[in-house]
Amino acid sequence: MFSIYLVCVSIISGTVTGWTYPDQDHWASLCQTGTQQSPIPLSHSVSEDSDFPPFSIYGYGQNISILVKNNGHSAEVRQKTRTHIPEISGGGLPEVYQLDHLHFHWKSEHTIENYRFPLEMHLVHYAKRFGSTQGALKHPGGVAVFAVLFDLSPDDVQDFDPLLAEIATIQTKLNVPDELEGFVIKNYLPIDLAGFYRYNGSLTTPNCTEGIIWTVFTNTIPISKQQVEIFEKMRTVNDVILEQNYRSLQDINGRNVQLKVSPLRFMAGGSTINVATFSLIFLTCIITFT
């Protein structure tokens, strides 16, 4: 068993400090001068229909230990023991990527068809051959981020309760991690990963490093309004309520945005999946959770 430690992407991008979300117009470096910045508005009209092979995913079904921390910008978690690291390949990716961390944005950073979702989770990965995110960021395509969008459900999602209980505990406790056992990453992924947008962009926090491969899944997972509100009560380093922590939309600037259309549509509040549905999933997107 190993543990993961959820970390805000700004730490990964190079120890940039002193920035806030209300002050986005003054973010320095590539945040102002870059031409391939993230997030962007996504829609069928700006994308090109594409066909990608299925993803191959390893290690996302394990029960793991995590340390959850409020770093003043997001909920963060980082792996403590770098063994049995979750990996992903296929899906049009150029190589094998290993999971570095997860973090959350409320509301969503990306929009789809002009709709902004209540929550977005980023799974930040680095190319395995580089051995770390710091090394991978020096190479275009060295870092791949997978975005999972959450949509509102009338009911709480019980799988999320343990993590949200920890986040509630650290809302006002900055940079002091709490430990949680039995965290399963795949519980935070859509059932069907066959549909997604793919484009080249940047980190969404300073210093906004470019050369990032983005995958934004089109199928969402449910979360209740009450559960989202737990994120919205987190505090910043200045003891200000962090009601929102998303970057404004950036210009596409002629970039090629690809869309693989999912044969199925799983939205928040979806009911049980029958045998025929599962058969179709595995015919179109073979995913291994081990």
Go through each PLM region and give its residues.
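Alpha-carbonic anhydrase
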Residues: 2-290
